[in-house]
UniProtKB/Swiss-Prot annotation:
It is a peripheral membrane protein. It catalyses: Zn(2+)(out) + ATP(in) + H2O(in) = Zn(2+)(in) + ADP(in) + phosphate(in) + H(+)(in). It comes from Paramagnetospirillum magneticum (strain ATCC 700264 / AMB-1). This is Zinc import ATP-binding protein ZnuC. It is an enzyme of class 7 (translocase). Part of the ABC transporter complex ZnuABC involved in zinc import. Responsible for energy coupling to the transport system.
Length: 262
């Protein structure tokens, strides 16, 4: 069974259609990234996946035993005294083993904030703490809504590498919403382009050439993603498989820096 499977999901709010017949599957060790314009229903889709919103139609099956969630942001009232240590400890049912909080914060590059109050954290520090909190649960599925918001560029690369490592090295399934299209195209296994319905989905290279993707993001964005095209005698199927040109692999293409396949 997949870690997460959505089939034919429809959702309305206030008489407006938010999601229309959305299908999505997340398997162990796979990174699925949802992209789309503002108002496309991306965050709502994650909330349906988590069970925070009930769809009007369709099915949601969760095979994951433990889910780690990083929201787009979390606002904690300034009058609430809550230390980072306590905030992290609340994520797990039992008291964490000695040193585990420190290790997890160090992993996300935020070891220096353990003794501080949550309300005193910067936006980037808070996102790192939220990711640490999700990882403390030892999840088999990570659900991430813009996980690097407010983090500087160098820090973004570090956190995306960490997320990728969770999938590749530990078999964690990842469902992520991101506006960082360059990173998405480099690191993800499967892209879902959402605009209330699924406009297109598949391997990043395939999606980046799809007419509906181009219509949503424009040719300038598509041109800026040329770094992810390659100059070999093969192309890719929708699932990312390597195809000779004679089998529908498309035109010859060239690899850019950071490309992870040949």
């Amino acid at each position: 069974m997949s870690l997460l499977n959505l089939s034919g999901v429809r959702l309305s709010h206030g008489g407006h259609l938010v999601l229309d017949r959305v299908d999505l599957t997340v398997d162990a060790g796979r990174i699925i990234t949802v992209v789309g314009p503002n108002g496309a229903g991306k965050s709502s889709l994650l909330k349906v996946a988590l069970g925070l919103l009930r769809p009007d139609a369709g099915t949601v099956e969760r095979g994951a035993k433990v889910i780690g969630y990083v929201p787009q942001r979390l606002d904690i009232g300034r009058l609430l005294p809550l230390s980072v240590r306590r905030f992290l400890a609340m994520a797990v049912a039992e008291r964490p083993p000695a040193g585990r909080l420190e290790e997890t914060l160090d992993l996300v590059g935020a070891g220096h904030v353990l003794g501080r109050q949550v309300v005193d954290l910067s936006g980037g520090e808070m996102q790192r703490v939220l990711l640490a909190r999700a990882l403390l649960r030892r999840p088999d599925l990570l659900v991430l809504d813009e996980p690097v918001g407010g983090v500087d560029v160098a820090g973004q690369a570090e956190l995306y590498d960490l997320i990728t490592g969770q999938a590749r090295e530990h078999g964690v399934g990842v469902l992520m919403v991101s506006h960082d299209l360059h990173v998405v195209m480099a690191a993800t296994d499967h892209v879902v382009c959402l605009n209330r319905h699924v406009c297109c989905a598949g391997h990043p290279e395939t999606v980046s050439r799809h007419p509906e993707y181009l219509a949503l993001f424009g040719p300038r964005v598509a041109a800026s993603l040329a770094i992810y095209t390659h100059a070999h005698d093969h192309g890719h199927g929708a699932d990312g498989s390597v195809l000779p040109l004679a089998e529908g692999g498309g035109e010859p293409h060239t690899h850019g820096p950071g490309c992870r396949h040949g």
